[in-house]
């Protein structure tokens, strides 16, 4: 086997020695406070806005690492989860979790993405986070994922973000110039270099969000990786379309949209909103430069667009059903997201208090009208206010949307 073969190349050798992410010892304990972003038990309406959660999904985790596939199998017991990876130590830990938690629905394979077709399987959900940007040919990898996707299925992917990782790329270039490798001496030098950075270095902002860099494996994966690249918005979309897929949307939308929820009368944001969608996303990623990862969904071209298209620009959006996203909600007069909270206006709060996962925006506006709070305005005015409010909250990742049943 040659050194450039996916089973034996520099990336495979790295993950054989440096196990990453950090292995989870107990899934029951971990899932009390944590969750996987693309896990359908939490996020099915983001993946499939047109349908309820389906427990018997066929799920592929392409590049499962140490924990991810076992987490999906643990939280989706009726699903069939197939996992592939190039790291035997990572798969060994997945096997440990499978045995510990009785995950009969988890199937493990030592297999690179480039050889995915040898499984001869197709899937409802294909998850690949943190893998494609390490491949020798990411386009070929994305095509492999596309080829095993069912018509109504979803590819859920993560790629490194170019602007949020500028500090990482600067340090990586320094370490390459110094000839650092993945040995203990190189790791020691890298740690010292990071400790010497001035407060204004671009990496400092990244370090405030990267909580796992205390481990040597995480440091190697971030700064001393054998092969990696970062992507802009437009490059993410291009990678999707190069595989014959359609870009379905962002999983985390907040970094890609202007937010009139906070600045309601901004002329600049109004100008951004007039741009074509991909161009607007590109503009915003160059302003919101802390976004180090792109999480997005893609699907087949023959999947009906009405199954996944969210469009608040017409009155048809009044038939959307808003649902709180994971760990989002209302407490007293506050609204909260993971990690922060704020006080909405009384008018906004009146709408938020009516969200129950069943009422449409139209019905919520009717409830607000009947309560008389906030006072003033016709029902049509309240419906317009609600439509714009829930568009803002959807862009802020506070709510997901359930589309009305077709037919």
Swiss-Prot record:
Alphabetized CDD domains for the sequence: AdoMet_MTases
A Gene Ontology molecular function term of the record: methyltransferase activity
A single cellular component GO annotation: plasma membrane
Listed name of the protein: Uncharacterized protein Rv2067c
Lineage: Bacteria, Bacillati, Actinomycetota, Actinomycetes, Mycobacteriales
Pfam families the record matches: Methyltransf_12
InterPro entries named among the record's database cross-references: Methyltransf_12, SAM-dependent_MTases_sf
Top-level taxon in the UniProt lineage: Bacteria
């Amino acid at each position: 086997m040659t050194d450039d073969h996916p089973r034996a190349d520099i990336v495979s050798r790295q993950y054989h020695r440096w196990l990453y992410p950090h292995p989870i010892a107990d899934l029951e304990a971990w899932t009390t406070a944590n969750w996987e972003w693309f896990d359908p038990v939490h996020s099915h309406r983001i993946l499939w806005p047109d349908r309820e959660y389906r427990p018997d999904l066929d799920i592929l985790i392409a590049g499962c690492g140490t924990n991810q596939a076992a987490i999906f199998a643990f939280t989706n017991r009726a699903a069939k989860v197939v996992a592939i990876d190039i790291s035997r130590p990572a798969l060994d830990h997945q096997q440990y979790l499978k045995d510990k938690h009785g995950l009969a629905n988890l199937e493990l394979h030592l297999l690179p993405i480039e050889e995915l077709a040898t499984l001869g399987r197709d899937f409802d959900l294909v998850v690949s986070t943190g893998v494609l940007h390490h491949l020798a040919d990411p386009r070929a990898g994305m095509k492999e994922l596309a080829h095993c996707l069912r018509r109504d299925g979803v590819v859920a992917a993560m790629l490194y973000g170019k602007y949020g990782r500028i500090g990482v790329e600067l340090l990586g270039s320094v370490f390459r110039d110094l000839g650092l490798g993945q040995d203990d001496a190189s790791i020691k030098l890298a740690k010292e270099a990071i400790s010497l950075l001035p407060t204004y270095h671009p990496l400092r902002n990244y370090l405030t969000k990267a909580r796992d860099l205390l481990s040597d494996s995480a440091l190697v994966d971030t700064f001393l990786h054998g092969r990696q690249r970062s992507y802009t918005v437009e490059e993410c979309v291009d990678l999707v379309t190069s595989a014959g897929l359609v870009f379905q949307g962002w999983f985390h939308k907040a970094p890609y949209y202007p937010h009139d929820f906070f600045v309601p009368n901004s002329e600049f944001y109004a100008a951004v909103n007039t741009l074509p969608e991909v161009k607007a996303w590109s503009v915003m990623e160059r302003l919101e430069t802390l976004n180090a990862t792109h999480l997005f969904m893609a699907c087949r071209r023959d999947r009906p667009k009405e199954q996944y298209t969210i469009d608040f620009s017409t009155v048809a959006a009044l038939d959307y059903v808003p649902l709180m996203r994971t760990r989002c909600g209302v407490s007293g007069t506050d609204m909260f997201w993971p990690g922060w909270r704020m006080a909405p206006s009384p008018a906004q709060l009146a709408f938020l208090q009516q969200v129950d996962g069943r009422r449409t925006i139209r019905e919520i506006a009717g409830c607000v009208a009947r309560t008389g709070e906030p006072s003033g305005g016709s029902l049509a005015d309240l419906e317009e206010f609600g439509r714009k409010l829930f568009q803002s909250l959807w862009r802020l990742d506070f709510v997901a949307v359930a589309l009305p049943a077709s037919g």
